[in-house]
């Protein structure tokens, strides 16, 4: 299988989507940030010095999804119809799971937008809590599902 972002001369190229059909595209990705009990309590109780941590992470995830084509070199700019961010606190593990759903009507998928949104949202949590806990760990960033397009649907088996 040939990589789609390389031309015949093996140089980087942006995929031509001119002949693709416009379809509804949707992708959901998630990731986890683990932290100390003190950092977790600060995040959940909104007592961080930098403001409301989870709400800021939601806004950052939305912004990250919208800016994907500006920071990932071969991503096409997309007209995004919907971005939904969910945050799930996991008190027993002192962790937060952040998920991003992105939807559009377009010629190319929104997987990268969902993954970028998750990454930026989790990095924002790290930034806002690093004064409390520099040992936080961001992990398990993964595409959980996607629908639409030529390659069909995908659902992660372990999700």
UniProtKB/Swiss-Prot annotation:
Pfam families: MoaC. Homohexamer; trimer of dimers. SUPFAM superfamilies: Molybdenum cofactor biosynthesis protein C, MoaC. GO terms for biological process: Mo-molybdopterin cofactor biosynthetic process. It is an enzyme of class 4 (lyase). NCBIfam families: moaC, PRK09364.1. Its EC number is 4.6.1.17. It catalyses: (8S)-3',8-cyclo-7,8-dihydroguanosine 5'-triphosphate = cyclic pyranopterin phosphate + diphosphate. This is Cyclic pyranopterin monophosphate synthase. Substrate binds at residues 74-76, 112-113. Keywords: Lyase, Molybdenum cofactor biosynthesis. The active site is at residue 127. GO terms for molecular function: cyclic pyranopterin monophosphate synthase activity. HAMAP family: MoaC_B (MF_01224_B).
């Amino acid at each position: 299988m040939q990589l789609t972002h390389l031309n015949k001369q093996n140089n980087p190229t942006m995929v031509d989507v001119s002949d693709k059909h416009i379809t509804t595209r949707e992708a959901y990705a998630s990731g986890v940030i683990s932290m100390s009990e003190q950092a977790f309590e600060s995040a959940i109780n909104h007592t961080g010095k930098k403001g409301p941590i989870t709400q800021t992470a939601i806004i950052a995830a939305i912004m990250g999804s919208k800016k994907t084509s500006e920071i990932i070199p071969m991503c096409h700019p997309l007209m995004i119809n919907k971005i939904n961010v969910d945050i799930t606190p996991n008190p027993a593990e002192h962790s937060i799971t952040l998920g991003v759903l992105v939807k559009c009507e377009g010629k190319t998928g929104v997987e990268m937008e969902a993954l970028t949104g998750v990454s930026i949202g989790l990095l924002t949590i790290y930034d806002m809590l690093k004064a409390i806990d520099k040992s936080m760990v961001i992990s398990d960033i993964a595409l959980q599902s996607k629908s639409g397009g030529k390659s069909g649907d995908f659902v992660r088996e372990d999700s």
